[in-house]
Structure formats: structure tokens, C-alpha cells
Amino acid sequence: MVLYFIGLGLYDEKDITLKGLETARRCDKVFAEFYTSLLAGTTLEKIEELIGKPIVRLSREDVELNFERIVLPEAKDKDVAFLTAGDPMVATTHSDLRIRAKKAGVKSYVIHAPSIYSAVAITGLQIYKFGKSATVAYPEKNWFPTSHYDVIRDNKERGLHTLLFLDIKADQNRYMTANEAMEILLKVEEMKGEGVFTPETLVVVLARAGSLEPTLRAGYVRELINEDFGRQPHVLIVPGRLHIVEAEYLVEFAGAPEKILEEV
């Protein structure tokens, strides 16, 4: 039979596309994972009510280590839906799952949905000017990742914007805020000292993208690091070289200081 990778969109249960909803309703079994992203405006129960079916929620271990044991056997003789926040193929994990399905002889289809990669356009920053993205992860006892700093540096050298995803530890109910991400990046700056991310760096914060009232703020790190952006999920953007229209948009819609108009 068929395994459908279905995106749920960005914020609540109403973000799923009509095609995705109709397909999920037709499926014999429905699985979902929420450890790669957060749908802040809904609950599993609301999604179940909309689809009209019970949903089996999978953990990171279920998906990454036991997909062949839990999901693929069901898809051998049933139509199965695998629901994910955002667009299903944005997460590398899901691309790997589709490869595994093909190797197991299971046919699969992808049904897209709104993604942060498109919603970030609400910042007014031009999509084609974004460079490589990166994730700011929580440091651990013997591990302090710094690759995101290098990505920002490389993008800045090319005049490109950097979209930073913020760490999610769903099993611990920990969702990194933009404030925490800025603090981590300042610590990396102290370690590396390359002037890539300082209190004078211009940043853009987007919170709850996809909701009717997202928070959009732009300013210097020293101004925003203690600001309350409301509930997660948050993303942090470090702009590269700004076009005048981008700068004007940030001033008008994100409260950026007018000083940035003089710097373009």
C-alpha cells in the first residue's frame, strides 16, 4: 500500500492543506512526530478531532531507530499517514525515512505544507538572499557546538542572511528562546573573537510564525536580548547586506532602528 508523508504546517491544526487533510482521513493508520518542530497553537487531541482518527505519537527513538519495526510493516498492507509539523521534507530525518521506505519496497508520497522557509518572508528579507541555515543547540556538559557561528560568518562574507533554528528537546519540554540563542552566540563570540556576533549585531526575531499574530522584532542584540517575545517557537535571523526595501520593511514592521537606513 502507500505511506504518505503529510505536513501539518506551522502553528495549528488548520494549517494542514486540504489535500493533506483528505488523505489523512482516508488512511487506515495515522502516525505523527513532534520532536523536530513545535505546533504551538494546537494539541494532538485537536488534530485527532479534525482528522477523525486516533493518532499514534512517535518519539525520536521510535522514528530514528524503530521506523522499520513500527511504521513500515503497517504500510505494507495499509495506507498509512505520517504527520509532521511544517513541511515533511524540510527535516533531513524525514528524507532518510523515505529512503528507508523505498528500500523496504513501500511506495510513498509527499504532501507539502507551509514551512518556516516560506513563512520567514514575513520579515521582509528577500528569500533568495538567504544563505545556509543552521541550528543553535543547547550546550551540554562536554559539548559546546559552535558551527552556527561559522555559518553566520560565511554567510556574512557573501552578504547573505542566516536563518537560525533553535533547539528543541520535546521530551524535556524545552524549546529554546531567541534570548537564549543570543546568549549562546555571545558566548561563542567570546571564545572565537572574530566579531561575527556582538552586542552591536543586527538581528531579527520571528515568534509563532504562521499564527494570526506573530511577533516580529528587529534591532541590535544589546536591545533585544532581554525582550519578551512571547511563546515559542522562535527563530533568529542574522541579516547580511540589506537592500533599501528590506531595511525599510524592518523599520516599518519590525521596529528596527532607523539608523539601519543609513547603512544600506
Swiss-Prot record:
One of its GO terms (molecular function) is diphthine synthase activity. Signal peptide: none annotated. Keywords: Methyltransferase, S-adenosyl-L-methionine, Transferase. GO terms for biological process: methylation; protein histidyl modification to diphthamide. Its EC number is 2.1.1.98. Belongs to the diphthine synthase family. S-adenosyl-L-methionine-dependent methyltransferase that catalyzes the trimethylation of the amino group of the modified target histidine residue in translation elongation factor 2 (EF-2), to form an intermediate called diphthine. The three successive methylation reactions represent the second step of diphthamide biosynthesis. This is Diphthine synthase. The gene is dphB.
